[in-house]
């Protein structure tokens, strides 16, 4: 059976979300149309507003409605000499939730992936280099994902920072707190052993 063009368009549009296949998109569309049209209208308005009004911070590239995000606009944090480099704005939220970092961020919006056409320019590394040249950065903390692409990106940025005599560190990877060793993969265990600390 074929749906009306508008229903079909809604279902197809919902499939653009990560992890949403045809069945999930259909369930979402039917939920909004059958049971919660007001929520659907609120969702549509919020989505339209976000798509037109949310851009990227001119300094760190995270999402913001202003020219600078609240962290970069902050008198205290905006002047920090530590910059944590992450792949996505979601990574910023995860680190902020921990409350252990009080410096600035730089959001790559991805990682190096030559096969996908993602090089240094697509990651905004020229802007990061401007920060490094300014003399206001003493340390880069690399918090890219522990993947082949994330590691390659971290090495590329580390080489860039060393040219400017900026200290570079990488967040530790290993066994999660509360995790059981029998469920940890061998690569993570190897990282844990190699990164062990004295007590």
Swiss-Prot record:
InterPro entries: DNA_Rcmb_RecR, Rcmb_RecR, Rcmb_RecR_Znf, TOPRIM_dom, TOPRIM_RecR. May play a role in DNA repair. It seems to be involved in an RecBC-independent recombinational process of DNA repair. It may act with RecF and RecO. GO terms for biological process: DNA recombination; DNA repair. One of its GO terms (molecular function) is zinc ion binding. Belongs to the RecR family. Residues 81-176 form the Toprim domain. A zinc finger (C4-type) spans 57-72. PROSITE patterns: TOPRIM (PS50880). This is Recombination protein RecR. SUPFAM superfamilies: Recombination protein RecR. Transmembrane segments: none annotated. Keywords: DNA damage, DNA recombination, DNA repair, Metal-binding, Zinc, Zinc-finger. The keyword Cell inner membrane does not apply. Pfam families: RecR_C, RecR_HhH, RecR_ZnF, Toprim_4.
């Amino acid at each position: 059976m074929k749906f009306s063009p508008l229903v079909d368009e809604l279902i197809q549009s919902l499939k653009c979300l990560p992890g949403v296949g045809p069945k999930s998109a259909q369930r979402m569309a039917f939920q909004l149309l059958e049971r919660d049209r007001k929520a659907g209208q609120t969702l549509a308005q919020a989505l339209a507003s976000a798509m037109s009004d949310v851009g990227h911070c001119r300094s760190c590239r995270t999402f913001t409605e202003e020219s600078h995000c609240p962290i970069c606009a902050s008198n205290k944090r905006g002047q920090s000499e530590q910059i944590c480099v992450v792949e996505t704005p979601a990574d910023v939220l995860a680190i902020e939730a921990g409350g252990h970092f009080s410096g600035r961020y730089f959001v790559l919006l991805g990682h190096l992936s030559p096969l996908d056409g993602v090089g240094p320019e697509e990651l905004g590394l020229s802007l990061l280099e401007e920060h490094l040249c300014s003399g206001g950065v003493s340390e880069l903390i690399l918090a890219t994902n522990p993947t082949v692409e994330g590691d390659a990106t971290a090495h590329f940025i580390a080489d860039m920072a060393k040219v400017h005599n900026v200290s570079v560190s990488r967040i530790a990877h290993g066994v999660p707190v509360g995790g059981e060793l029998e469920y940890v993969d061998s690569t993570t265990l190897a990282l844990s052993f190699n990164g062990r600390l004295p007590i």
